[in-house]
A protein has these predicted regions:
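Glycan-recognition surfaces
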Residues: 103-137, 181-288
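Flexible loop/turn segments at secondary-structure boundaries
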Residues: 19-22, 50-56, 95-101, 161-166, ...
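Short acidic/histidine-rich active-site segments
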Residues: 47, 153-165, 199, 204-213
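Aromatic-lined carbohydrate-binding/catalytic grooves of carbohydrate-active enzymes
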Residues: 4-144, 154
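C-terminal beta-sandwich/jelly-roll accessory domains of carbohydrate-active enzymes
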Residues: 350-416
């Protein structure tokens, strides 16, 4: 649904892992200035811009601008980002409410609850009762004021906890078990209003805490954030599994900082880019502080993503590696519908001593046609040979192969 369903998505940079809650207008503009020079197309302001939110202890439900952080207001920030030629996106967690919020003080009964039982805090927040129209109307009204106040072109809709004490203050006892269903219908209702009233806005669902990457969400949002675990090696299994049910174009995937903030692992910038290319592609880091070598490689990384994005979005996807069986390597392939080209990607997770070069068989090619790898146009190989004899993934001793842990390689095959 929506105009982005079949379109290439903007290459965004999200400030979450760059700043967490510690940001202001000047910091976001600094990130945007550097990002715009590198070819990044959108700045997304994540959690911490509303209420009086300096940590996860407050303000969910108070969807008005935190003036202490955004001096000059939201429109000023968005206008400054737009002047750089970039789009602007914003984070909401519309289903949640903090005990320390104006909304909870005014309407404590709006939280999902079972009468007589204490409410369970998770990430210092409760869940709003979306079975109630007055709750949805209030949240939508606050979101609408924000969206109408500036040129916002993307929403990240987050959900950072599961449901507990699943009951409603308005339902009779014999109908309390309906709340699970009524709640989801309420979420759909609000998303429907958003996507109807703002069809130009790209809606990305995000549910690291609620584990809600599902077809219902995909109807309203053409992309969903896979996981807050952004480590490239962790993402191999995450994205492999997600792609079994959902198109790669729906998988939110970013190049993040190193050491990775979740697992502490260092991986090459190139590998992080190759893994993120399988999904929507973007950046989750502070471009003003990363090593110069990494910063300098971003324009070429973006160029590579743009070159192959249509093939990734519309081609046939083949999972060639078996990370769940042999966690030393992974590989995948995208083949154009007309079999005119194929993109093969390989990640060496762990280097091993005295191991033979791997021979990997491609899939989905035209058996009787001939193909050449983009960097070797004079070397033509039949599709049958590529699929039955395979290709040799060179090892480090020949001078041009893969060296060490966490390295990657892509090969682009073109039909003659």
């Amino acid at each position: 649904r929506g105009e982005y369903k079949d379109k290439r998505r903007p290459i965004l940079i999200n400030n979450w892992e760059a700043t967490y809650f510690n940001f202001d207008t000047d910091k976001l503009i600094d990130i945007a200035k550097e990002a715009s020079k590198l070819g990044i197309e959108m700045l997304v302001m994540d959690d911490g811009w509303f209420g009086h939110r300096d940590s996860d202890n407050s303000s969910l439900g108070d969807w008005f601008v935190y003036d202490k952080k955004l001096k000059g207001g939201l429109k000023y920030l968005v206008d400054e980002v737009n002047k750089l030629g970039m789009k602007f996106g914003i984070w909401f967690e519309p289903e949640m409410i903090s005990p320390d919020s104006e909304l909870y003080k005014a309407h404590p009964d709006w939280a999902i609850q079972i009468k007589g039982r204490p409410l369970t805090l998770c990430r210092e927040q409760y869940v709003l009762d979306y079975s109630r129209k007055e709750v949805r109307d209030h949240v939508y009204g606050m979101m609408k004021k924000i969206l109408d106040s500036a040129n916002i072109e993307y929403i990240k809709w987050d959900m950072n906890r599961q449901l507990t004490e699943v009951g409603s203050a308005t339902l009779p006892a014999e109908r309390q078990r309906e709340l699970w269903h009524r709640y989801v219908l309420g979420v759909y209702d609000l998303m429907d209003r958003l996507t109807t009233d703002y069809p130009h806005i790209l809606l990305e669902n995000c549910s690291g805490g609620g584990a809600r990457f599902d077809p219902g969400m995909l109807y309203y949002s053409p992309q969903i954030w896979c996981s807050d675990d952004t480590d490239a090696i962790e993402r191999l299994k995450i994205q492999h599994g997600t792609s079994m049910c959902y198109p790669c174009s729906a998988m939110g995937a970013h190049v993040s900082d190193c050491p990775n903030h979740t697992v502490g692992r260092n991986t090459p910038f190139k590998t992080r880019g190759h893994v993120a290319m399988v999904g929507t592609f973007g950046y989750e880091l502070d471009v003003t502080r990363i090593p110069q070598e990494d910063r300098d490689s971003i324009p070429a990384q973006i160029e590579e993503f743009n070159k192959f994005n249509k093939l990734v979005r519309t081609g046939d996807h083949y999972r060639i590696g078996h990370m769940f069986e042999d966690n030393t390597w992974d590989a995948w392939e995208f083949v154009a519908k007309d079999k005119s080209e194929a993109l093969f990607e390989f990640v060496q997770v762990l280097g091993r001593p005295n191991e033979r070069s791997r021979r990997i068989k491609l899939k989905g090619l035209e058996a009787d046609a001939y193909y050449y790898e983009e960097n070797e146009p004079d070397k033509k190989i039949s599709g049958a040979a590529l699929m039955n004899a395979g290709i040799n993934i060179a090892k480090m001793w020949n001078g041009d192969g893969l060296y060490g842990d966490f390295c990657s390689k892509i090969l682009h095959f073109i039909k003659v």
